[in-house]
Amino acid sequence: MAASEIPMAGYRSKLLTRAEVAEGTMAFHFEKSARFDFKPGQAADLTLSNPPETDAEGNTRTFSIASPPFENHLTFTTRMRDTAFKRSLKKVPLGTQVKINPPTGSFTLHKNSAKAAVFLAGGIGITPFLSIVRQADHDRLPHKLHLFYSNRRPEDAPFLDVLQMLEKTNPNFRLVCTMTEMSKSKKEWKGETGLINQEMLSGHLTNLQGPIYYIAGPPAMVAGLRKMLVAANVDEDDIRTEDFAGY
């Protein structure tokens, strides 16, 4: 059954499924209207109607859309902080109605395929990039895509397996994952460790000044990486950012 339209104000949708995609992180899948057009990398407001509990932060949150446009549902993914909104989202019955507003934002892939895209993601900041790289793969875009993905441990990394599989099947996509707290992990890790820095980028990119950079993650990380890129003589017009605060 298709989601119900609410002209100019988004539409009513239903919660279809939910699942844990990393420790302390859940993905929520909702109906998508055939008229809900969005670009990979955009976000949307999600409002719970009559939730079982509420608090001063209210019943609406803005989430990047983690699913690509070619899928017939919408996925929102979030760290499960202990708030009334997220407790409600975790426990309301499947089939619960919500309101989803029209998509917003311009954190989207550039059109000039001659310039590579370099995505720098921290934790839940992976969500817009997941949508972008999956849609690019689906559309067979010629862009060269490089994703540097930082987490504390493999246990904390949402969609790591999806991205690793995508790298194996798409020659235009390169994935570099790094873990910053492997001493606290119970899993084996053979990839990079430590924070994303200029040395790490230089080890995987032939020309730091050539690509368009996209940075998404905690505000301190975003600010630090932007400063690092500017110091490396990357044109500020080639740096695009999105903060993920409070997640």
Give short role names for the model-derived ranges.
Residues 2-96, 151-153, 180-181:
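Ferredoxin-reductase
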Residues 5-11, 85, 144, 148, ...:
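Reductase modules of NAD(P)H-dependent flavoproteins
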Residues 117-120, 214:
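Conserved beta-strand elements of the Class I
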Residues 126-138:
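Histidine-anchored nucleotide/phosphate-binding helix
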